[in-house]
Amino acid sequence: MMSYLKQPPYAMNGLGLSGAAMDLLHPSVGYPATPRKQRRERTTFTRSQLDILEALFAKTRYPDIFMREEVALKINLPESRVQVWFKNRRAKCRQQQQSGSSTKTRPAKKKSSPTRESTGSESSGQFTPPAVSSAGSSSSSSSSTNNTGISSTSTSISTVSSIWSPAISPGSAPPSVSLPEPVAPSNTSCMQRSVSGTASSTYPMPYNQTTGYSQGYPTPSGSYFSGVDCGSYLAPMHSHHHPHQLSPMTASSMPTHPHHHISQSSGHHHHHHHQAYSGTGLAFNSSDCLDYKEQTASSWKLNFNTTDCLDYKDQASWRFQVL
């Protein structure tokens, strides 16, 4: 009646008659299209059958196919039942030995509890240790994925660092004028780089040095150097003068430019501000600023980019853009 309760009460267009509902109409006929595989009933051994099996087990724990066939004929059971009985009997013997030494009692109990059950009983015991090992491997793999996630975040940080880099790219300057600074990316800080002009390839330094820059200038250079606002800050500036550099300013489309490209724009940027605002009157690099018409420091505002200093007359009209 269980199969009848699981079936819908009416046949849907005659489809419900196949399967277990047919077994109700013809209970004597077995149909292979049952919805669920029926569990095989347990084989119950009589005392005489067990005596014969135990006698063979005393002789050998691993009987070959011929010995199993012979015993199966004696006890009037199929050979597969004899094979499963020997398998479970060996498992029971192992469990007794392990319980004597009190090691691995739990998985052994799973093996030994059904002495005469088929292979499902032992497979349940056999699958528990691989589950533990697979859990260990999954934890190790998760830790490895964590490591790779960390490394990927670091690499993403390094790629984000390239948002700033294409400030003094040869795209704005003529290709013949190659910059001497970005050839050797060193690990010097951005403050040192603003004086020495050496490129800095480390990502956090240009942004960690914002306080150093903000000491000299009252403008909010923290928002200027925030890692997220770099692309959105540089993009509107470059949209006025160099529309071909809009795409390098976005973080996603910047895989090709070198890393010292960012520190360059930041470093050179403030390099000139140190020269301009401190009043030292140092000459500008000819490679950085190719054709300045007005080099007075009063006309340059803080958002002055070295990419924009190629023959622009109206530096006084540029303002600092606070985002």
From Swiss-Prot:
Domain of life the protein comes from: Eukaryota
Pfam families with a match to the protein in the record: Homeodomain, TF_Otx
Compositional bias (Low complexity): 128-155, 168-178
DNA-binding region(s), residue ranges: 38-97
Single GO term (MF): RNA polymerase II cis-regulatory region sequence-specific DNA binding
Keyword DNA-binding among UniProt keywords: yes
Location of this chain's protein in the cell: Nucleus
Annotated Gene Ontology cellular component terms: nucleus
Single Gene Ontology BP annotation: retinal pigment epithelium development
Coiled-coil annotated spans: none
Disordered as annotated region, ranges: 91-155, 168-204, 239-277
Expression sites (tissue/organ): Embryonic expression is highly dynamic. In early gastrula embryos, expressed in the involuting presumptive anterior mesoderm. Found in the head rudiment at 9 hours of development, and at 12 hours of development expression increases at the caudal side but decreases at the rostral side. With the extension of the body axis, expression extends to neuroectodermal regions fated to become fore- and mid-brain; detected in the presumptive border between the midbrain and the hindbrain at 18 hours of development, and found in the diencephalon and the midbrain at 24 hours of development.
Segments of skewed composition (Basic residues): 257-275
Keyword flag Nucleus: yes
UniProt keyword list: Developmental protein, DNA-binding, Homeobox, Nucleus
Biased amino acid composition, Polar residues: 94-105, 115-127, 185-204
PANTHER family, alphabetized: HOMEOBOX PROTEIN (PTHR45793), HOMEOBOX PROTEIN OTX1 (PTHR45793:SF9)
Protein purpose: May play a role in very early embryogenesis, gastrulation, and the development and subdivision of the diencephalon and the midbrain.
Family, per entry: Belongs to the paired homeobox family. Bicoid subfamily.
Protein name per Swiss-Prot or TrEMBL: Homeobox protein OTX1 B
Taxonomic source organism: Danio rerio (Zebrafish)
Gene designation: otx1b
